[in-house]
């Protein structure tokens, strides 16, 4: 499985901000690391997020909800989630509007992790 490093997420965030605008500043490195490393947590020797879909959804959810960046949290969360899934062999079938809706829903608190995971599963390409 291809993992995303702190450096990769920071670079992707910079590229997104350059392309779409906003502040490139990092608010809290610990919140960023928590989002990135949290998907690999274990308890009693068992992964808390064992599937690629679970890891991807958790990564997207925590990047958005942790607010590690001054700006662009929704954009980086959804982009990293979708890219993580794709590089790990999971193709998605969703429109830009679908992605925007999911990102805004997570940010507003109307979509939790389990609901984002369901969204990922429902938008997986067949």
Task: Give the location of each predicted region.
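FIC/Doc superfamily catalytic core
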Residues: 1-126
């Amino acid at each position: 499985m291809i993992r995303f490093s702190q450096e990769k997420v920071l670079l992707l965030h910079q590229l997104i901000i350059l392309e779409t605008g906003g502040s490139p500043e990092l608010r809290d490195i610990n919140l960023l690391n928590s989002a990135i490393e949290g998907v690999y947590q274990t308890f009693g020797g068992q992964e808390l997020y064992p599937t690629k879909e679970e890891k991807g959804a958790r990564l997207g959810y925590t990047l958005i909800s942790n607010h590690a960046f001054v700006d662009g949290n929704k954009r980086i969360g959804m982009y990293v989630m979708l890219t993580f899934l794709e590089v790990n062999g999971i193709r998605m079938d969703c429109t830009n509007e679908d992605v925007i809706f999911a990102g805004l829903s997570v940010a507003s608190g109307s979509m939790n992790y389990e609901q984002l995971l369901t969204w990922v599963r429902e938008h997986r390409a067949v």
